[in-house]
Amino acid sequence: MTTTTRRKFGIAGALVGAASAGVAAAAMAKRYAVGRIRLRPDLEASEPFGELRGREHTLITSDGVALHVEVDGPEGDGGAPLTVVLCHGYCLSSESWHYQRRDLREQHRLVLWDQRSHGRSQRAVTGDTSIDRLGDDLAEVLETFVPGPCVLVGHSMGGMTIMALADRHPELFGDRVRGVALLATSAGKLAEVTLGLPALVSKAVHKVAPTTVSMLGRRGSLVDRTRHAGSDIAFLLTRYMGFGDSKNVSPTLVDFAESMIRATPTEVVADFYPALMNHDKLSALHVLDPVPTAIMVGDKDWLTPPDHSRAMAEALPKAQFTEVPDTSHLIQLERPGAVTDALRDLIKRVSV
């Protein structure tokens, strides 16, 4: 090997070494940052996240998918006359209603369910993953587990599920469905959401996102095996994107939210992504007009921005609209008191 060749290899080795050192330093910096966050006082450290349970059931849908359903709260002849049905969002599970279950279960009959391919429900391997199918799933949950009047509560994709129910089963609203709460959700045009990025960057992201998500979905098993290695980054992203007051949010709560997201297989993320981007139910909102409706959104929600909730409120002028300050997308976890109080108020407004 000539002196020149050795010099070239030496330079290349130095560059690779420097790059590796840079990556390692960045990883250590992230780990250090997360470590410091976890050392802060944590008021939620003893909260039993993921431990609350009701009476567990399995519902086989008309297309053969097993849904996990839990019924909580009063039962029997002396039970509550009204059922509150909680519909969770994309990449979450029924556990995301932890605080609402904890605070409402003594007085109200609750039905919580994991949407297909989420939580403890079966993966819809060959089944439909459209928003319309989620609306049909909800109709089957109501038929099986809700014998009387109910209030529907939906967060994010769960709100879209309720809109699909209204579009496909409008006859249920007014008689069976007596009230609706739509939290941090959208009636459509999610492909135009900027995610807080500059317009040109956002446009570029949306242009490549469908192909990228589809590609990751095809390699889902491989991606899932590497997700744990990026847990510090996932923690920081969840903290930043999910919570408006991210500097003061409980690390235990962030871990809980991130664990639900991480438990959602990459293939499921890819399966549902096109349905979310194509979701358009603004024309179905009129079905909700006869029933008391509450619309809530955080003012720092970048995933389903406040403008989307305002558009729904304009379509439902009788709805009670609330924009919660210093709050992002995981509103029921970040501001549980405000959300639970709004649900109690909605229940009071519902005639049984």
Language model region names:
Residues L288-D289, I295-V297, D301:
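Short beta-strand/loop motif that positions the catalytic acidic residue
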Residues V65-R123, V141:
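Conserved HGGG/HGGXW glycine-rich cap/lid loop of the alpha/beta-hydrolase fold
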Residues L276, D299-T304:
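Acidic catalytic loop of the alpha/beta-hydrolase fold
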Residues R310, E314-V352:
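Catalytic active-site module of serine/aspartate enzymes centered on a nucleophile-bearing elbow/loop
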Residues E171, D175-L222:
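Flexible "cap/lid" loop of the alpha/beta hydrolase fold
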Residues T5-V34:
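Hydrophobic alpha-helical topogenic segments used for membrane insertion/localization
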Residues G73-G76, H118-D175, A187, V193, ...:
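Active-site loop/oxyanion-hole signature of alpha/beta-hydrolase fold enzymes
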